[in-house]
Swiss-Prot record:
Its main location: membrane. The chain crosses the membrane at residues 34-54, 65-85, 107-129, 139-159, 174-194, 248-268. It comes from Oryza sativa subsp. japonica. Residues 55-64, 130-138, 195-221, 242-247 are extracellular. This is Potassium channel KAT6. The segment S4 is probably the voltage-sensor and is characterized by a series of positively charged amino acids. The pore-forming region H5 is enclosed by the transmembrane segments S5 and S6 in the Shaker-type (1P/6TM) and contains the GYGD signature motif which seems to be involved in potassium selectivity. The KHA domain (rich in hydrophobic and acidic residues) present in the C-terminal part is likely to be important for tetramerization.
Length: 593
């Protein structure tokens, strides 16, 4: 992708998106980014060639001079292009696309002068004009190293790019800095030796007579050897400073090495600590859990469960996941939850056939959890605060017999539910739920489930109908297992006993009864229309009754109150009522005979 999401053109609040004018370059386009990457390659060449050319003047050739001119030309083009590149205002964070503002800002930058100076081939111009070399102009060529700031910006971007390893990016950066320091010091040592009047009074001349006639790579190898031994502070003594200038430079170089070494050691220490932080956290938590178990004399099996759950939590990084999600906007969290949990909800028996109006808010507050093998998810007789949808793995449903032993009732696999019986009936959990293998579940809280179903009456009917059918299937299974039937009859007769009172054909009516009821509507029913005084034509003032749930029940109520069957129901304005839902609290209803 050409630009990251956060780098797109962002308008001011309430204003239309900015558009790039003619001859204005978007700094986030793919072509401009590739141009910057190409310049990075040229910067790396400059970082090696400029000091080397300074030290090895005898290695200068026409090919090297042409290469330098071509490289300088590319950077000159970049300076010209930068007058047309939009920039992001630091105070507002908006992209400025006005060409006058871009040019004014670029001209006001102090680094423009250094950019231009580093592009001008001063030594070559002096040589063409005077016909000879000058050491001072050779040193001015080191202004090209100003381009190294591009490499620094590159590493700063790579460290923030999650596609690249932060550890390896930092290590490569440290290696690059070290190699450049060694190369630069080596070239300075050679430059000082070649330009000293008494060649034998130099660090290399005292060991190798006539070194100026040796090959370029021999001299460079000796310089790198001395530079790196100085950097590493080993100093074998075979090479050493032989004049005052070399001594002063060696002092400055060793002072620089002290700072560089501290920087490298500090960075590597920070990287190592960062990589092992989670391990230290886990070890500390495991140790505290172990001490807690021993102090409270918990059974060995319970301690093992605690350890397994703790280790699984760190491996799955559940805590980190929840912390990350909590920092996101609610709409983003909801979208993530839809992607992760919607399939599990729709495949579960309890929510089959419900609309998105129920699924969307239900999924928004779900949480994923993982349990190791043989971990207790729900305990028998505990409060019904949550139920679970099994995404992967398998759990077993257990009941405790009178002698205290546990007996398996059934196994539940993926797309099954656990703990919903206690939640639906609002009773203590009738069974113990224990994982048989590594199990991933989605947790739904009791309060959230009730608050989501309550306003969605039609979907609530579907949910309770599915639950009734599930209870009917439990009755069949319970007949095959006497101890389960006895257990439910003795302790929680409402669980399967409720299934008996729910006929499948009457599940909708039963579901209506189980749904939280709204405030009843009170209406006045009249046998005849009202006259001008507010009383019925036959003198009756009507009857105040509770509005039934259906039109049929309302008709039966009128027949019971007035002794005859009505053909229709009218409002005060004479409109015929066709749906019970349109009748409001306090309405006057009139029956047509």
């Amino acid at each position: 992708m050409a630009a990251s999401r956060s780098e797109l053109l962002r308008p001011a609040f309430g204003e239309p998106s900015p558009s790039l004018g003619p001859f204005v370059v978007n700094p986030h386009t793919c072509s401009y980014r590739w141009w910057q990457k190409f310049l990075i390659v040229l910067v790396l060449y400059t970082a090696w060639a400029s000091p080397f050319e300074l030290a090895m003047e005898k290695s200068a050739s026409a090919a090297l001079a042409v290469t330098e001119l071509v490289v300088d030309a590319f950077f000159a083009v970049d300076i010209a292009v930068s007058f047309f590149v939009a920039y992001r205002d630091a105070s507002t964070g908006l992209l400025v696309t006005d060409r006058k503002k871009i040019a004014t800002r670029h001209l006001a930058r102090p680094c423009l002068a250094l950019d231009v100076a580093s592009t001008i081939p001063l030594q070559m111009i002096y040589r063409i004009v005077s016909g000879k070399r000058q050491a001072l102009y050779g040193l001015l060529n080191l202004l090209r190293l100003w381009r190294l700031r591009r490499v620094s910006k590159l590493f700063a971007r790579l460290e923030k790019d999650i596609r690249f390893s932060y550890l390896w990016t930092r290590l490569i950066k440290l290696l690059y800095v070290t190699l450049f320091a060694v190369h630069f010091a080596s070239c300075i040592y050679l430059w000082m030796a070649f330009h000293h009047k008494a060649k034998e009074l130099t660090w290399i001349g005292s060991q190798f007579h006539g070194f100026e006639d040796r090959s370029v790579w021999f001299c460079y190898t000796c310089a790198v050897y001395w530079s790196i031994t100085t950097l590493a502070t080993v100093g074998y003594g075979d090479l050493h400073a032989a004049n005052t200038g070399e001594m002063l430079f060696s002092i400055a170089f060793m002072l620089f090495n002290m700072g560089l070494t501290s920087y490298i050691i500090g960075n590597i220490t920070n990287l190592v600590v960062h990589e092992t932080t989670n391990t230290f956290k886990m070890r500390d938590m495991v140790q505290r859990t172990s001490v807690f178990g021993r102090t409270n004399r918990l059974p060995v099996a319970m301690r093992e469960q605690m350890m397994e759950s703790l280790q699984l939590r760190f491996r799955a990084e559940e805590q980190l996941q929840q912390e990350m999600l909590s920092e996101l906007p609610k709409a983003v969290r909801s979208g993530i939850a839809q992607h992760m949990f919607r399939g599990a909800v729709q495949s579960c028996y309890l929510f089959q056939g419900v609309s998105d109006k129920l699924v969307l808010p239900l999924v928004a507050e779900m949480k994923a959890e993982s349990f190791p093998p043989k971990a207790d998810i729900i305990l028998e007789n505990e409060a019904s605060t949550d139920c679970y949808i099994i995404v992967s793995g398998e759990v077993e449903v257990l009941t405790t017999l009178e002698d205290g032993t546990e007996k398996q009732v059934m196994r539940i696999g993926p797309r099954g539910m656990a703990g919903e019986i206690g939640v639906m009936f609002n009773i203590p959990q009738p069974f113990t739920i224990r994982s048989r293998k590594l199990t991933q579940l989605v947790r739904i809280s009791h309060s959230h489930m009730v608050s989501t179903i309550r306003p969605n009456t039609a979907d609530g009917v579907v949910v309770f109908s599915n639950f009734v059918l599930y209870l009917e299937s439990l009755k069949v299974k319970a007949k095959e297992t006497a101890f389960v039937r006895d257990h439910l009859r003795n302790g929680y007769s409402t669980v399967l006993g409720s299934a008996t009172m729910f006929d499948v054909d009457e599940s909708k009516e039963s579901a209506h009864k189980m749904l939280p009821c709204k405030e009843p509507k009170r209406v006045s029913i009249h046998e005849h229309l009202l006259n001008g005084t507010g009383t019925a034509l036959n003198g009756s003032s009507g009857k105040l009754v509770i509005l039934p749930d259906s039109m049929q029940d309302l008709m039966k109520l009128s027949e019971k109150k007035f002794g005859k069957a009505a053909r229709g129901i009218l409002t005060v304005g004479g409109a015929e009522v066709e749906d019970i839902e349109v009748i409001r609290d306090g309405d006057h209803l009139f029956f047509s005979w």
